[in-house]
UniProtKB/Swiss-Prot annotation:
This is Cathelicidin antimicrobial peptide. Keywords: Antibiotic, Antimicrobial, Cleavage on pair of basic residues, Disulfide bond, Immunity, Innate immunity, Secreted, Signal. It comes from the Eukaryota. It comes from Nomascus leucogenys. The gene is CAMP. Residues 31-131 form a propeptide.
């Protein structure tokens, strides 16, 4: 009398189920985007919504903040894009386009999700005003240096004047 344990088909089904159990987690992991991949997808969305003539390409990606492991939770991102020489109507990937000389630079901030199936982002971009911020930092540092130098000069004058005063001997 044959039992089901001795059946070769039961062994095959067990093997198939075991293999499916091993493959399914890999399929789920494959659906999670890296931080940079999620940003690049957001840039594709920015290019699709843009009314500018040319595509934008990633110029600088700020360091990835510490995040939880949930790919469905929106992750904060900030990055800079620069205008390329490729027209927006082209089917080319922005990564294949050269940056336009003196092209417009935009600073972008918002959130992305790493879940490829959701593929959601909420990004807003503004003209990059870091040049003005750098100029402000330059003037602030210059003012600090001038202030320190002025104090040093005043102290030297005081020291000089103290040495000019005749000393009376007691």
């Amino acid at each position: 009398m044959d039992t089901q344990r001795d059946s070769p088909s039961l062994g095959r089904w067990s093997l198939v189920l075991l293999l499916l159990g091993l493959v399914m987690p890999l399929a789920i992991v494959a659906q999670v985007l890296s931080y940079q991949e999620a940003v690049l997808r957001a840039i594709d969305g920015i290019n699709q919504r843009s009314s500018d003539a040319n595509l934008y390409r990633l110029l600088d990606l700020d360091p990835r903040p510490t995040m939880d492991g949930d790919p469905d939770t929106p992750k904060p991102v900030s990055f800079t894009v620069k205008e390329t020489v490729c027209p927006r109507t082209t089917q080319q990937s922005p990564e294949d386009c050269d940056f336009k000389k003196d092209g417009l630079v935009k600073r972008c901030m918002g959130t992305v999700t790493l879940n490829q199936a959701r593929d959601s982002f909420d990004i807003s971009c503004d003209k990059d005003n870091r040049r003005f911020a750098l100029l402000g930092n330059f003037f602030r540092k210059a003012r600090e240096k001038i202030g320190k130098e002025f104090k040093r000069i005043v102290q030297r004058i005081k020291d000089f004047l103290q040495h000019l005063v005749p000393r009376t001997e007691a």
